[in-house]
């Protein structure tokens, strides 16, 4: 019997955070009080572990003792916190595995095994899960990469931070026929912002979708989730969801789950 994988959005914000988060939403998730982007697969695998990760894990009632692996998309503070990683690793019988780009510069951490990933190569993580990393178009000094999770033949891509699809990543993505694409949507429904060199806007994603289908990176039935939402650049959640309803996009929010 094939294993089901549950994905939980622990955070869906870019690095400008709503004041609601630190006022009346300290102990709960709210669609308009997003925390730093972070994700959980089942109860043992995290994607990113940034400045709000411990709060998000607490609110989601996740037991850090069960966490075996953390995949780091890049080393900006909203995605990686060394102290939090060491807190999660503390006391484990087996070292916590931290996955990152092959050339990442990272200080040693207690009880943490750093696994440096060769671009485009699948790594076996656990039964029924293999993962490959591809280059991300984001600030190079943060060693960015995106991930494609192969789960019993079903493929989920986590693509934040980063803009467009780079020619370096393209050979490893074409014909992947993703079941789910989770994509950076930092900027709102407009096309003139300095961040568009390393983040997506909604118009950029609309432009990409036909090409992604032509390249068989996605299919007509691929679920597309927008995450890494900058509150200052977007309308409130419900308005943003209505805005992309015709596109078939799903605007992710903290606490949202889906199964693969």
Model-derived features: positions:
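Structural motif
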Residues: 45, 69, 154-158, 180, ...
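Metallo-beta-lactamase
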Residues: 4, 93-152, 249-258
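Active-site metal-binding motif and surrounding structural segment of the metallo-beta-lactamase
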Residues: 50-99, 177-181
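Conserved beta-strand hairpin/beta-sheet module of binuclear metal-dependent hydrolase folds
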Residues: 2-60, 143-160
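Active-site metal-binding loops of divalent metal-dependent hydrolases
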Residues: 12-13, 44, 51-52, 75, ...
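Short amphipathic alpha-helix with an adjacent loop that forms part of the alpha/beta core around
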Residues: 58-61, 122-127, 169-175
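Cap/insert and terminal regions of metallo-dependent hydrolase folds
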Residues: 164-257
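Divalent metal-coordination and catalytic microenvironments
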Residues: 7, 48, 57, 74, ...
